[in-house]
Amino acid sequence: MEAYHKPDQQKLQALKDTANRLRISSIQATTAAGSGHPTSCCSAAEIMAVLFFHTMRYKALDPRNPHNDRFVLSKGHAAPILYAVWAEAGFLPESELLNLRKINSDLDGHPVPKQAFTDVATGSLGQGLGAACGMAYTGKYFDKASYRVYCMLGDGELSEGSVWEAMAFASIYKLDNLVAILDINRLGQSDPAPLQHQMDIYQKRCEAFGWNAVIVDGHSVEELCKAFGQVKNQPTAIIAKTFKGRGITGIEDKESWHGKPLPKNMADQIIQEISGQIQSKKKILATPPEEDAPSVDITNIRMPTPPNYKVGDKIATRKAYGQALAKLGHASNRIIALDGDTKNSTFSELFKKEHPDRFIECYIAEQNMVSIAVGCATRDRTVPFCSTFAAFFTRAFDQIRMAAISESNINLCGSHCGVSIGEDGPSQMALEDLAMFRSIPMSTVFYPSDGVATEKAVELAANTKGICFIRTSRPENAIIYKQHEDFQIGQAKVVLKNKDDQVTVIGAGVTLHEALAAADLLKREKINIRVLDPFTIKPLDKKLILDSARATKGRILTVEDHYYEGGIGEAVASAVVGEPGVTVTRLAVSQVPRSGKPAELLKMFGIDRDAIAQAVRGLVTRA
């Protein structure tokens, strides 16, 4: 970035005029919509004008060009001013702004990626900076390109802990290509923000987190130009003192106007007042970027060799995940791994050992880790794999939910699922994760049961759009598949089959192996069962499940190391509901567990081989 040169008076006036046009557009759009946040837009007008028409480098007619500077509107409720910017730049027709929030318009109430200029969906506050950190990390360390990343936050969202997780991350990794703009307009939604206009405290907090922090008058285009022109070898926070509703007579800096459009008669009067301050209608052209981002292809990434496991060998699927990811890393230098300080448990350390420059340690900040991954994945620059204990992904549920709204392609591996982890106890046991990930739109939920299946899951996830979750286990279990076994999403496997099977038993991970052990017990009693491995819990192989059920007198037994709610049993029951003559019996963890040996806990909660065998006997004798 070049050293700061003060713009001449003509440019400064043009920026003031641009800011006022953005104000007018925001007021017009929200009044036409009958809803929206004009006051939140008006506090940011000068910031947005200086950013997009003085500081940033981008191609106005190609918003997703990989060379462009990036912008994240973390305070997503100010979407109308973002849309106004892209109309001012010439990408959107100005008439489209009046379709804000209409069902047939792409201009939603908050930014979403169906808009070409939006990389990540925002509106659930506190998440934009984490995504911006992921973009900046990618720009600095993977692309090694000159594009910069800007993120505007509101003061209300600075109460979110995830913001400070991101602040810490940016400092640790010296993201000097990242600028956060804090729009300190004093007022939150229902009350003033906790610090109101105590700018020095904001500055001290940012500096304490390792940022270069600059206080500016957020309505002075000259001060903003100077602040954006400062170059430091650390991330920069521009702390802008602004006023909510700036330029709206009678409403500026007044409470109780959050999220309220102006009535038409008031809007017309205010627009007339603001228009009177505009000296020229001439628009400022966007400055094009330096074109130094490498071309990237993340399609069709395949394992270099087949799985190197032999049937009967034992390995935990969590370790097989680490080995698979390290292996896939050799197929593409755009495979990256992130972990939350659990890499020696999730085995992502194996990836770090072989590809140290593509491993991102996110420390114990799971919410931020997911946001970082979302940022890294934008514009198809990388294929991220995040790992931690599956239980700890639950604290990032909102980030995962927003990742789906962002149409992000990220892969999450949750280890240590279920009571089978043993002595560590319930705080470490994932028993809700399947329910959580199944509820995410367009998600794919893998639950591999051996090393071969795990390796295939990793490869498939890398090439699958949307949120992919891979559930791995702590216990070592036998390899049951040959190395060339073909796996596909939504395709279950019949692991054990006889002509006279009495019950179809569906298990995954540890419980699949317990089902196979139960089959041996039952065989001595001349009771045969069919054992299915679903491989993906979402989508589920409904056809194979129904075919198997019909071949076993309509009896299905599911067994899972998960709570009853939202897991395999409910997925299977939903798939076969309404099918005549088909019944589903479920075995799952029924209450909060405790510490103990894995075998003791499986037995205590009725999901071990003996419980499966007993349930099968009950189904057979009931006929």
Curated annotation (Swiss-Prot):
MF terms (GO), sorted A to Z: metal ion binding; thiamine pyrophosphate binding; transketolase activity
Binding locations of Mg(2+): 155, 185, 187
Signal peptide (UniProt feature, chain positions): none
InterPro entries: THDP-binding (IPR029061), Transketo_C/PFOR_II (IPR009014), Transketolase-like (IPR051424), Transketolase-like_Pyr-bd (IPR005475), Transketolase_BS (IPR020826), Transketolase_C (IPR033248), Transketolase_CS (IPR049557), Transketolase_N (IPR005474)
Residue numbers marked as site, Important for catalytic activity: 37, 258
UniProt cross-link Glycyl lysine isopeptide (Lys-Gly) (interchain with G-Cter in SUMO2), position: 352
Keyword line: Acetylation, Calcium, Isopeptide bond, Magnesium, Metal-binding, Phosphoprotein, Thiamine pyrophosphate, Transferase, Ubl conjugation
GO biological process, one term: regulation of growth
Binding positions for thiamine diphosphate per the UniProt entry: 40, 77, 123-125, 156, 185, 244, 258, 392, 428
Residues the record lists as binding substrate: 37, 258, 318, 345, 416, 424, 474
Top enzyme category: transferase
Classification via Pfam families: Transket_pyr, Transketolase_C, Transketolase_N
Cofactor remark from the record: Binds 1 Mg(2+) ion per subunit. Can also utilize other divalent metal cations, such as Ca(2+), Mn(2+) and Co(2+).
Active site: 366
UniProt family annotation: Belongs to the transketolase family.
Protein name, as recorded: Transketolase
Species this chain originates from: Bos taurus
Gene name of the record: TKT
